[in-house]
Amino acid sequence: MEILHRAGEADAVIMAAAVADYTIDGGPQQTKMAKDRPTLTLTLIRTVDILAELGRWRGSREHPVLVGFAAETHDLVSRARAKLQTKAVDLVVANDVSRADAGFEVETNVATIIDQATATEVPLGSKRELARLVLDRVGSLLSQRPSATQISPVGSHDSS
């Protein structure tokens, strides 16, 4: 996966959303489907969870800082904490999408920024302000870790 190589060169990886959780089993059809069937059944299969793969790849290394997002309608903190653990990331930004004035198709958001120790509620505000807060947290995490330049990129080996 190319992203694993590129992640080795990054100080932080912020994955705003899954590209798709599912895809059609067998991929695109090579021929046009006839319209003579009264019903059609599609079988969907899970796609690779790129953020979880990054978390597994990183393992115990401290770089890059990994940030994921979770669009939730209830139990924001508990569901985001579960993602923090299962995906092995440093931060999860849990967006409360149960409100009409926050989340999708509006310029405002309500979120909770969650790490291993804290859950910081972010009140209704602009998405730009939320992004600034997330980047501030990433910067804080980076300042507490050894420089990424001291870590060999993926695929390189010390021959000494």
Task: Show the residue positions of the predicted features.
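Small-residue (G/A/S/T)-rich helix-start motifs and N-terminal tracts that mark the onset
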Residues: 1-12, 89, 96-160
